[in-house]
Amino acid sequence: DEHEIFVEEAQTEKELVEGAGLRYKRIAATDHIWPLPAAVDEFVQFYKSLPENIWLHFHCQAGEGRTTEFLAMYDILKNPAVPLQDILYRQCLLGGSYVAHVEPEDSTYWKVPYYVEKAKHIALFYRYVQENEGTGFAVSWSDWIAAHELDDDADE
């Protein structure tokens, strides 16, 4: 049959990328929600290990949510003097989602709680970078966010 396809070789994404002579880094993150603190720590450590003027390729399944979250975090790390709103607009204009998007309070859309968390955490990540980039991020995101979420809980 002319429409049959025979798989002659199967590779993981990592095998394919490394087979082309490139380096591969995967950071696990669940779709629709802000990454776990350990994933953000891993990303910050990865960022710190990068040489100057490196090219990176980011993607998730759809190329929007998680991709834009990590691109925004990378942009924040790379450009700490740029206002957060400018970074988020830039990432959106480049084709990503708007990470600080929040639906109206009366919305029944199932993703609303996740949007609220993302908007809160991208602002906190920006603040984390502002406070810690001068020390080379001696304080991990996990430690920093644990202390600041406790502060936020006390304020409520």
Residue positions per predicted region:
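Alpha-helical scaffolding within the catalytic cores
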Residues: 7-14
